[in-house]
Amino acid sequence: MEIYDINGQIIDPLAGKTLYVAGDSIAYGKGSAGGYGKCIADRYGMRLINEAVDGATLATLVPDNVNGGYRTSIGMTVKSSTELEKADYILLEGGVNDAWNNAKLGALNGSFDPAFYSGDTIGTLEAMLDDLAKKHSDKRVAYVFPHGGLFASSENWYKTYKPAILSALKKWGVPYVDIEECAPPMGAHGVSELSDKYTIDGTHPNKAGSERFYMEPIAALLKRL
C-alpha cells in the first residue's frame, strides 16, 4: 500500500531512514565507492553507515595471505559496532571470502543457546544474529547473497557455505535477497561481456552493476520488512 503526502506524492517508506551495511568488499564498494548501499541511499533518500571491509570474512582469525595478519570478521565488526543504534535497517552480506579461503565452516547450533563457538563461519554468523536479536530487536535486519559466476557449481560455496548460511538465516528468521536469482552470472564462471560492463573484475560491481542488479531487489526487500 502506497502512502501519499498532502500534495498527492508518494512517500517512500525508506526515505529519511538510516541504512547500516556490514560485509566484505562487495558491500564495501570496491568497484564503486559506497557500493550498493550508497546506490540505495542515494536513490531513496536514506542516510548510509557503511562498515563493510574489503576482504572481510564471517569467521574470525582467517589468515590474510595478502596483507598479513588476519582478515576482518564481519560478525565481530557488527557485534562491536557503536553505529547500530542509529540504524533503522541493518543489511548484512558475507561468506564468499570464507569459501575462497577455506575458513572452518562449523555447524548450525541445534538450539538458541548463546554459547556459540564464534571462531568458524556459522558459529560467528549465529553469534552475530543472536546479538542483534537481543540488543537490536527494533531494527529491521536482512542479508544479501551476491551475484553468481564467482564459483563453479561444483565448488564449496554452493556445496557447503551458501546452504549453511541460508540455513542459519532461516533458523533466525532473517530475510534475504539472492542477487544470483535476478542477475546473470558474472566473474570467472560467468558471462565475460557482462563482467566487463557491470564489474571491475568479475567480482566487484561497478556503479552500473550495483544500480542494475543490486539496488532494486535489495530496496524491495527492505520495503517489505
Report the location of each language-model feature.
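A short acidic, glycine-rich active-site loop
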Residues: 111-120, 200-203
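Catalytic His-Asp segment of secreted/periplasmic serine-dependent ester chemistry enzymes
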Residues: 146-225
